[in-house]
Structure formats: C-alpha cells, structure tokens
A protein has these predicted regions:
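A structural signal for well-ordered alpha-helical scaffolds and beta->alpha junctions
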Residues: 11, 22, 117, 164-168
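A generic structural signal for short, non-catalytic loop/turn and secondary-structure boundary residues
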Residues: 20-22, 47, 117, 126, ...
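Secondary-structure boundary/capping signal
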Residues: 26, 99, 179-180
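Rieske [2Fe-2S] iron-sulfur-binding domain
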Residues: 30-157, 214, 234-246, 251-253
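C-terminal catalytic domain of Rieske-type non-heme iron oxygenases
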Residues: 61, 138-259
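A short, hydrophobic C-terminal helix/tail in secreted or cell-surface proteins
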Residues: 260-264
Length: 264
C-alpha cells in the first residue's frame, strides 16, 4: 500500500473521502451515562476528526454541538449548562440543543442579532447505552434504527470505553483478525480444559491450543462474516472450536464464541 492509498483509507477529517462516507451513517459518539444528568457538565467528543460538545439540558433533551462557540471560538465544553442551554463562559452567549442562540449577555437589551446566529448542531439519538450522532448532509440523513447488535434493556452488558492512539482502520483490523489472538494475547486468552470459551476474573479461557485457525468467509449485505476454525483440546478428530467474527460496515466488529461442535 502506498502512502497515498493509506491516507485515502485512514483519513476521515477535512472532507476526506472516507470521512464523507462515514458521515452518511449514525456514529456512536459517547456513552449515555456520560451525559446522564440534566444540566450536568458538558463533555468533549472527538468524532471523525471533529471536536464536538455533548450535554443534557434542563428538560432532559440531548444536545450535540460543535465544540467552539460561533462568536469567538471559545470551547463550549467549558460553558455553563443551565436553563435549557449552554452559556459560553467568554461573553455569555447561550445556545440550545438545536444550536439556536437564546441569549447574548454581552449585547444591549432588546437586540435581535441572536436570531442571525446559530451554533452547528447534530442530530442525536440514544440506544443501547450509547449516544449516536449523524454528521452528514441533513438532506440524505437516514432514519435512525438501532443496529441489531446494540444491547436492549433486557440485556445484561458491561460497556468499556478506551482511548487508543491509532486510526480507525488499525483498530478495526485488529478486531477482525482472529489469528493473532493465540500469540499476542496468549497471556490472557489461555487454553484450558473447559466446555466452551469462559471468562474468569483475570483471563479468558478457551478450549483450544490451535494457533493456526482455518478461515471460512461469507460476504453479506452488511459487510462480511467469517469463522476461525480451530482444533479443540478434546475430540479434535471429530469436533471444531469456532470463533465467528462479524464485520458491519463501515467500522463495527462483533465477536461470537461457540462451544466445540461436531463436524457435519
């Protein structure tokens, strides 16, 4: 891959083609629990190369705006979240969840200049414990439908958010690649005499010592899925241990583990 091809794949900011593609999708931007409190502290979001601010107003409505105030570019992460809007700490301009300028504390009483000012806002929805934002052209915005893999209220889930210094393609490649786990993660994915993949307090047990899985891949309407087929510790002549990886375009990966199963 040339440096130019690498940039074409990995860059998402400043109008890059891949960024334009991703902006046609609803993007998970933060956890709902990070903005759970009405009039709580705003949080910064870094999404597709842009800095945004998320907050929940006095009525519980969720807002996602460009981080910088349209007046003097002060950070709205430092704003006061009060009375149904973010009030910029610099000059007191106040914006609601739709980006409307509700008040200009630094302007003369009765001014109507605020009718001409608007902060850029982004449609936001909540589902599965996440805040999802749409950052593309409003004219082509798809209806929001929680993805099939998103947790539902009756699910017991543990959600972990990690900041990784890499581009989106690097981390996705690592998630999709099943073969590396036997070597790179050998200290925390331990072969063991168990019936199926099983988590403990410190390790992840799996019933296989096979470091060279066979791959079977299937293209789908949403991306692709493939099976990494390993020999299990027991019944290796008649059974397989399978880890299924599901890729959902453009940037989601789901891992599914199964018990050793008889071969058809």
């Amino acid at each position: 891959m040339t440096p130019e091809e690498n940039d074409l794949l990995c860059r998402v900011e400043n109008g890059a083609p891949m960024g334009k593609l991703m902006r046609q999708h609803w993007v998970p931007a933060c956890l709902s629990e990070e903005v759970a409190e009405a009039d709580g502290t705003p949080i910064r979001i870094r999404a597709l190369g842009d800095n945004l601010v998320a907050f929940r107003d006095s009525k519980g409505r969720l807002g996602v705006l460009d981080e910088n105030c349209p007046h003097r570019r002060a950070s709205l992460v430092l704003a006061r979240n009060e009375e149904c809007g973010l009030r910029c700490l610099y000059h007191g301009w106040k914006f609601d969840v739709d980006g409307n300028c509700l008040d200009m504390a630094s302007e003369p009483p009765g001014t109507q200049m605020n009718d001409k000012i608007k902060a850029r806002s982004y449609p936001a929805r909540e589902a599965g414990g996440f805040v999802w934002v749409y950052m593309g052209d409003p004219a082509t915005m798809p209806a929001f439908e929680p993805p099939a893999f998103a947790p539902t209220p009756d699910c017991r889930v543990s959600t972990l958010k990690i900041h990784i210094e890499c581009n989106w393609a690097q981390v996705l490649e690592g998630q999709i690649d099943s073969a590396h786990s036997s070597s790179l993660h050998s200290s925390d994915m331990v072969p063991a005499n168990v019936d199926a993949a099983k988590a403990t307090d410190t390790t992840w047990l799996r019933p296989s010592t096979d470091k060279a899985p066979r791959m079977q891949c299937e293209n789908t309407s949403y991306g692709f899925r493939y099976a990494a087929i390993r020999k299990p510790i027991h019944n290796a002549d008649t059974h397989d241990y399978i880890r299924t990886t599901v890729y959902v375009a453009p940037f989601t990966c789901c891992l599914l583990y199964t018990s050793p199963s008889p071969r058809d």
